[in-house]
């Protein structure tokens, strides 16, 4: 099922085609996904690093309806916003998905191949005894290595997860960790894995503050990175790069910024990037900082609780 794929875009990411092709190839799918508008919000901030916003007004309850896309180039940022919209649409449970779901307890799944929720990290109050008799929704998925079909708890697939059957019980609060789209299956799988590695490395760093090394900005020779750093520097925005690669061994970099001009605590932004190519990891972290800033200024996303708290706390305290 997984194939060797030839890459054709290397400027600020590794993709199978140019961003212009991504936009052209998927334009007709925007209506299906409910994406009504993709807007350039780069100029809302003074940095000048491309950021776009995509809007899905009819996103399901519990999901955000405004998404952001980042990139070192305009078309890359536009494609990024569009593809995030597709990700979120694909994560929602559609009517066609409900037709494939089965409702059963673990005890009654003995005749099927399934992913046992006992192997997942669950809230401590959900014990094995409770799991055995809890009625869950299960969705058929394909193992990409063995190409065999397994039933997986629907709670771990869909976001937001609202059981379609009243007798089914959610096990945990859902999230979009590891959700990724791509021009081809292999590209989506790779970037989903990168996101999981990235979140894992950041969690370890937050917990123990080890495996960190500051990167000397002046030592970087990559022209794309230099251009991004120069854009921040020209606007008196200090950027610190840290290598927080975990024991997994895939390069993970954080970029944190402090705006000496505005001194707005909500613009104390952080970006994290993971990639097999360290330069791409840095580019992803830097463009995520730009995305975070523009998103806060844009003020349309529903998940800005952190920014509101930081503004309330004040710049000096943060």
Q: Where are the language model's segments positioned?
A:
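Helix-biased "structured C-terminal domain" signature
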Residues: 1-318
């Amino acid at each position: 099922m997984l194939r060797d794929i030839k890459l054709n875009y290397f400027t600020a990411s590794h993709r199978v085609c140019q961003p212009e092709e991504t936009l052209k190839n998927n334009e007709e799918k925007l209506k299906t996904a409910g994406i009504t508008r993709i807007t350039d919000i780069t100029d809302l901030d003074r940095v000048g690093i491309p950021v776009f916003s995509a809007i899905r007004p009819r996103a399901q309850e519990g999901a955000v309806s405004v998404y952001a896309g980042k990139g070192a180039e305009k078309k890359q940022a536009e494609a990024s916003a569009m593809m995030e919209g597709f990700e979120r649409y694909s994560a929602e449970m559609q009517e066609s998905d409900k037709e494939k779901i089965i409702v059963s307890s673990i005890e009654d799944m003995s005749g099927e191949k399934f992913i046992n929720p006992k192997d997942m990290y669950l809230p401590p109050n959900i014990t094995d005894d409770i799991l055995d008799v809890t009625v869950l929704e299960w969705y058929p998925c394909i193992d990409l290595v063995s190409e065999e079909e397994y039933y997986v708890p629907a709670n771990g697939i869909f976001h937001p997860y609202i059981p379609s059957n009243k007798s089914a019980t959610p096990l945990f609060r859902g999230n979009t960790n590891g959700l990724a789209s791509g021009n081809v299956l292999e590209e989506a799988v790779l970037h989903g894995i990168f996101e999981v590695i990235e979140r894992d490395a950041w969690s370890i760093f937050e917990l123990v503050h080890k495996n960190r090394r500051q990167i000397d900005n002046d030592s970087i020779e990559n022209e794309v990175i230099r251009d991004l750093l120069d854009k921040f520097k020209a606007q008196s925005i200090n950027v610190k790069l840290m290598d927080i690669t975990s024991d997994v061994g895939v390069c993970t970099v954080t970029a944190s910024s402090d705006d000496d001009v505005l001194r707005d605590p909500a613009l104390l932004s952080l970006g994290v990037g993971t990639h097999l190519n360290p330069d791409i990891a840095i580019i992803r972290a830097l463009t995520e900082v730009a995305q975070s800033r523009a998103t806060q200024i844009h003020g349309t996303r529903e998940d800005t609780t952190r920014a509101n708290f930081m503004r309330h706390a004040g710049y000096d305290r943060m």
